[in-house]
């Protein structure tokens, strides 16, 4: 069969969008890996799938497959693209869209200029729920590494786990070497996304993220949220922060513990196509 898809990106974090409602298709890890392959497939960081929700209270189910075929819990940049995509496909005309994910619900607010604000929910800070091997919850943790010795990180889950490491300069941060080590660190039993954060001012940070299962990407929405939460908990940042990523900037707002993290940024359609599967 020929599978219809749309290629989109959020600040360079690129996606193959699949409508599995109006076309009968099942996306398996193997099929996702084939689609994501930049040499033999369409090519993307993640494959995002729109499905019929299990609950009548949600508009859609949102599934995310990494470049390596692994299915993951959440993707913030993808959520913005998801909201624009379902409207483009005529699956909904709503400007406020509720989606099911593997770890709960997300609410997506589409604005007239295709900027999308995503209610990412409250961050998860308990080590057992991140998950992180630590005796008790703290604003920062010590992580022993081969490449940099003992480093201090913040640890947050935005539905997927993040370690946030403060650096003096993002441009020279050891993302390519330390990123894979943090990602696979035994203190994180489900692996972890590794964020390298440079605080420019209390209202602005620079950020690079080595994503679990994908490597470094041009942007990571959940990583931006996690970095702001970690920075706020350590007293470094204000409630609303401009997050500069290699692919562009996001606005992240977090009022504090138990409040949802709100992420605002663009979603861009690149092209529509078909691929034989």
Curated annotation (Swiss-Prot):
GO terms under biological process: lysine biosynthetic process via diaminopimelate
Organism (species): Saccharophagus degradans (strain 2-40 / ATCC 43961 / DSM 17024)
Similarity field: Belongs to the diaminopimelate epimerase family.
Compartment list: Cytoplasm
Name by which UniProt lists this protein: Diaminopimelate epimerase
HAMAP family for this protein: DAP_epimerase
Catalytic reactions of this protein: (2S,6S)-2,6-diaminopimelate = meso-2,6-diaminopimelate
Annotated substrate binding sites: 13, 46, 66, 76-77, 160, 193, 211-212, 221-222
Site feature: Important for dimerization: 271
Site residues by UniProt (Could be important to modulate the pK values of the two catalytic cysteine residues): 162, 211
Coiled-coil spans in chain: none
Subunit-structure text: Homodimer.
Keywords noted in UniProt: Amino-acid biosynthesis, Cytoplasm, Isomerase, Lysine biosynthesis
Domain of life: Bacteria
């Amino acid at each position: 069969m020929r599978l219809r898809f749309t290629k989109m990106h959020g600040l360079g974090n690129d996606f193959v969008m699949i409508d599995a409602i109006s076309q009968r298709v099942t996306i398996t890890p193997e099929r996702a890996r084939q689609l994501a392959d930049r040499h033999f497939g369409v090519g993307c960081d993640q494959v995002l799938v729109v499905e019929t929700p299990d609950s009548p209270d949600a508009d859609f189910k949102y599934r995310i497959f990494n470049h390596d075929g692994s299915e993951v819990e959440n993707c913030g940049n993808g959520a913005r693209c998801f909201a624009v995509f379902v409207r483009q496909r005529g699956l909904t005309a709503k400007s406020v869209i509720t989606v099911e994910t593997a770890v709960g619900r997300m609410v997506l607010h589409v604005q007239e200029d295709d900027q999308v604000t995503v209610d990412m929910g409250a961050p998860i800070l308990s080590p057992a729920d991140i998950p992180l091997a630590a005796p008790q919850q703290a604003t920062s943790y010590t992580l022993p590494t081969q490449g940099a010795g003992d480093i201090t990180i913040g640890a947050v889950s935005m539905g997927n786990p993040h370690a946030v490491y403060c650096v003096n300069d993002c441009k020279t941060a050891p993302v390519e070497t330390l990123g894979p080590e943090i990602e696979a660190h035994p203190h994180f039993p489900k692996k972890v996304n590794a964020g390298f954060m440079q605080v420019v001012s209390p209202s602005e940070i620079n950020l690079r993220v080595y994503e679990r299962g994908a490597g470094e990407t041009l942007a990571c929405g959940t990583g931006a949220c996690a970095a702001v939460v970690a920075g706020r908990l350590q007293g470094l940042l204000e409630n609303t922060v401009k997050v500069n990523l290699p692919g562009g900037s996001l606005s992240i707002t977090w009022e504090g513990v138990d409040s949802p993290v709100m992420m605002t940024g663009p979603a861009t359609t690149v092209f529509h196509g078909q691929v034989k599967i």
